[in-house]
């Protein structure tokens, strides 16, 4: 762990590791579906969507197919079979990096990216940068991990043969607790996985003070208070942003300030157990039920791994070391993959405390102490200039950090509703109905219901995240 702490100090930046139905009672006043084209609401509200920039990464190099040559394989093993944090690399290892850079195989640049992520030695960084430029071209700084990885993502460069073994060697040399994640039978695309800047959260269940690990500390079964108790203090103001959850008639508010610190909650509400990850990097709070699973499967306890996939936090299950897709809720490695575990999602509403507590007067809310005295306000600070981790090519229909409410239709096709446009249209008296999905105000946020007023599961996120995990998504309103 000492190596990782040194890396954290050197980097000196606080990072966040980055269907339909439901249990809520039906909403009685479901709007009637509007007539005419669903994506062209009538009324006075003027839609003005902030579109994104198209980034020209140039022409992708051609990658070969098949196995690595014996010489390239030997060089690859040489640069990954030692302690990656050992400073400096030997001359033989530096020569091996140069040799791979002249191989003409762009697939090897993924390994350069992985090593560069943990590199503090200037000589090694230069060697990796020169080799990356030799493989991919000179139009960028090959020693810049972000610039290199953005191109690999945008170009969809294939991974080299045996990539999982090389990546396991690199990451486990930094933190041994990551090694079980690199399971050969898993379904992770390891190209997309990178270090989020923190170590793994392996706090025991129900022992989560948050002060005992150099990690993003989850909280289990958090202490809560009533609206009356909350209003006695001055911590929560009417404008405080919260994530609202209502299950079987029981409501709870999770202040964003706390979720920016904790990023993971394991809780019970309305008789249902669930895990609630919040990815600060992709603006996404989600609820995944962790009960009603197949016989023999114990309740999953979700934690933050310290890793990211395309700037989305990678969560894992504490007792089985099974990696989960945080955005999609399915197990990707380990015993829970073997069991075919797909968690059921529940709606989360982003609202202000004032509007949520007025609409849900019996709601509870997490207590201030869970924020550990921290107030990151990432949106106004760290993330004010856009994503801080590589995301590759993006869908330019919206700016990358515009909020959308993402929903998967019954036929499996995705659609995203631009949040600000939807709120503006609804406040102007318009109705929004697309394929039986009706968007309504909730607190001062939005949620989706069907034509009978039943909840349709959805969650909010930044556009770049939703559109990358759902590449063929529709967008409302149409651009």
What is each PLM-predicted segment?
Residues 2-10:
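Sec-dependent signal peptide recognition
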Residues 15-17:
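C-terminal motif of bacterial Sec signal peptides marking the signal peptidase cleavage site
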Residues 19-28:
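Bacterial lipoprotein signal-peptidase II cleavage site
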Residues 22-23, 99, 128:
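Intrinsically disordered, low-complexity serine/threonine-rich segments
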Residues 27-95, 105-479:
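Mid-to-C-terminal functional-domain signal that highlights helix-capping/loop sites
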């Amino acid at each position: 762990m000492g190596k990782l702490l040194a890396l954290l100090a050197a980097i000196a930046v606080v990072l966040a590791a980055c269907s339909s139905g439901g249990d809520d009672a039906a909403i009685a006043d479901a709007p009637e579906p509007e007539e005419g084209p669903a994506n062209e609401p009538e009324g006075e509200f003027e839609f003005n969507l902030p579109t994104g920039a198209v980034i020209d990464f140039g022409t992708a190099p051609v990658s070969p197919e098949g196995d690595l040559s014996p010489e390239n394989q030997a060089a690859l093993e040489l640069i990954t079979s030692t302690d990656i944090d050992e400073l400096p690399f030997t001359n033989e290892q530096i020569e091996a990096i140069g040799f791979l850079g002249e191989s003409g195989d762009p697939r090897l640049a993924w390994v350069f990216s992985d090593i560069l992520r943990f590199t503090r030695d200037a000589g090694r960084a230069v060697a990796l940068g020169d080799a990356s430029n030799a493989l991919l071209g000179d139009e960028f700084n090959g020693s810049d991990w972000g610039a290199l990885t953005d191109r690999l993502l945008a170009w969809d460069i294939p991974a080299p043969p045996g990539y999982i073994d090389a990546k396991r060697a690199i990451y486990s040399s930094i933190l041994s607790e990551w090694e079980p994640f690199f399971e050969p039978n898993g379904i992770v695309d390891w190209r997309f996985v990178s270090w989020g800047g923190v170590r793994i959260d392996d706090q025991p269940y129900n022992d989560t003070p948050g002060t005992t690990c150099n990690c993003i500390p989850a909280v289990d079964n958090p202490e809560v208070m009533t609206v009356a108790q909350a209003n006695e203090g001055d911590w929560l103001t009417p404008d405080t942003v919260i994530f609202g959850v209502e299950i079987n008639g029981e409501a709870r508010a999770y202040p964003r300030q706390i979720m920016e610190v904790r990023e993971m909650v394991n809780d019970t509400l309305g008789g249902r157990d669930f895990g609630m990850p919040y990815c600060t990097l992709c603006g996404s709070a989600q609820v995944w039920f962790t009960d009603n699973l197949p016989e023999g499967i114990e309740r999953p306890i979700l934690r933050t791994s310290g890793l990211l996939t395309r700037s989305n936090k990678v969560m894992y299950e504490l007792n089985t070391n099974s990696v989960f897709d945080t955005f999609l809720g399915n197990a990707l490695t380990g015993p829970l993959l073997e069991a075919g575990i797909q968690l059921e999602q529940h709606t989360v509403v982003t609202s202000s405390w004032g509007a949520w507590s007025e609409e849900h007067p019996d709601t509870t809310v997490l207590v201030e102490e869970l924020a550990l005295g921290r107030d990151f306000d990432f949106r106004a600070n760290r993330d004010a200039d856009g994503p801080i981790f590589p995301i590759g090519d993006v869908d330019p229909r919206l700016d990358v950090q515009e909020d959308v409410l993402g929903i998967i239709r019954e036929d499996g096709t995705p659609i995203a509703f631009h949040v600000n446009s939807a709120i503006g249209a609804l406040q102007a008296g318009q109705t929004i109905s697309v394929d039986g999905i009706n968007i309504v105000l909730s607190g001062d946020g939005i949620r989706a219901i069907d034509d009978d007023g039943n909840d349709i599961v959805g969650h909010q996120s930044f556009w770049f995240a939703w559109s990358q995990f759902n590449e063929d998504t529709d967008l409302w309103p149409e651009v």
